[in-house]
Regions:
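Short beta-strand-to-coil "C-cap" segments at the C-terminal boundary of structured domains/repeats
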Residues: 127-132
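Conserved GNAT acetyl-CoA-binding A-motif
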Residues: 73, 80-92
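Short alpha-helical
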Residues: 49, 94-98
Length: 132
């Protein structure tokens, strides 16, 4: 995905084969456009337990704080609920405080931290119930 290579937080973006592998089953891939692609969000049925895993997403820096990420997340959550998923799960890194704040503001809770050195690489697992 060419767009992911333009998101500065993604140090080493995944190759297309990884996207194909993860999206082999039930998935949702969204692209936001403002004359051109400016953001994306991809999720899939990773755990096969009624949860939907929000795997990857980002917005080009020039288009942040314009509601793009909010719109993508709203669509993903609505789609997941309509497709009988009960939870949205995501994993981020401690260094992505903007993503953590965005998720907390959307009603996610932190469920687990996987400590990694250096500390900013610590993985933060979050979830949001879709039944409310």
């Amino acid at each position: 995905m060419d767009l992911s290579s333009k998101i500065p937080e993604f140090n080493s973006p995944y190759k297309i084969d990884e996207y194909k592998k993860r999206c082999a089953g039930k998935y949702l891939a969204l692209i936001a456009e403002i004359d051109k692609p400016v953001g994306f969000k991809i999720g899939y049925d990773r755990f096969k337990n009624g949860s939907f895993y929000s795997w990857m997403g980002g917005v080009l820096p020039k288009f942040r704080r314009m509601g793009v990420a909010y719109s993508l997340a709203n669509f993903q959550e609505k789609w997941a609920a309509e497709n009988k998923f009960s939870l949205i799960l995501l994993k981020t890194r401690k260094k992505h405080d903007g993503m953590i704040a965005f998720s907390l503001n959307r009603g996610f809770i932190i469920t687990e931290e996987t400590q990694i050195t250096p500390d900013e690489e610590t993985r933060i697992w979050m979830q949001k119930s879709l039944n409310s």
